[in-house]
Amino acid sequence: MKILALGGSGGMGRFAVRSLFNHKQVEKIYVADLNASSAIKFASDFDDRVEGLGLDITNNAALKNKMSKVDIVVNTTGPFFKFAEPILKTAIETNCNYFDICDDWEPTEKMLLMNDDPRSSDITAILGLGASPGLTNILAYISMMELDEVEKVYTGWDISSAKPEEESSQTGVNAAMLHGVEQMIGQVKVFKNRKYQMVRPLKEIKINYPSIGEKSANIFGHPEAVSFPYHYPEIKESLNLMHGEERGFIGTVKFIRLLIEMKLITKKTAARILTWLEKSLTPKTQKLSSISLPSVYGYAEGVKDGKNVAVGTTIDGDVRDLTMGEAT
């Protein structure tokens, strides 16, 4: 099995490559990155099964050439609102199986529709194999399976506990932070009252989490909100929520959004501020409460044995100290 790891020496890609390398059936991993020297240097940490190379994914001819020589492409190249859809299209055209960690709802919608492309029947494409989406979907699914009838499905996480990677090939603005900026401005798509709706992100939602009680979280644009009703159209509501336990964090994020929408700062400047803010948070930062929502969770409301109940599923253990790459 030969694998092309796009963005393979980036903050997320490094963890994917290390994990794939441990599988004996993997014959070759091509670590492809716009930063060729970083890809080659990272690949040198492994044996000859891993090779680093430079690749500009916006060069479609070069991308097709590389994909046509492998069995699987693993896409960890962000921001996904810019790159996910065209890369999957190329995978379909070259008959190459596709996996990604796409965390934007807009391309997720478009990529799900590609299932209707007759050419796609020859490949397997799995979207959102990260922490969120990915792990959150599994946690929410476990919660759903505890119910006889499911009405609401929420995925959620603590945005203030996500720490960026120390090692990455990326220079300039952090792609994950650009993603975050895009999903907190304007409007995002959610599923409410059995239909898709565009709503204002960061709107406060109350969630009565089992054994914890009523807590506040905020709507954040993400694939889970649109992918659950795609697969389970019988549900009434699907949201992705984020919370920030550090005192004043959500207020700070809303203020940054205001500056963007007043055109006082650019999206790239906002992304740089968010990157600095996440790196500045420490375990000593004052918390809002000693009892908070889990760092990552899946939540469902519905009916069990004729009674209205809520189910929450999280990871056994604290994941607050994990970086985004480790969690992914």
Would you name each region that the model predicts?
Residues 4-19:
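N-terminal Rossmann NAD(P)H-binding glycine-rich loop of SDR-like oxidoreductase domains
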Residues 55-69, 76-79:
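Conserved Rossmann-fold cofactor-binding substructure of NAD(P)-dependent oxidoreductases
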Residues 145-328:
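C-terminal catalytic/substrate-binding lobe primarily of soluble NAD(P)-dependent oxidoreductases
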Residues 79, 90-108:
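ADP-ribose/adenylate-binding Rossmann-like module
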Residues 35-37:
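Helix N-cap at the beta1-alpha1 junction of Rossmann-like dinucleotide-binding domains, i.e.
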Residues 102-123:
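Rossmann-fold NAD(P)-binding glycine/threonine-rich loop
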Residues 28-30:
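Short beta-strand element of Class I
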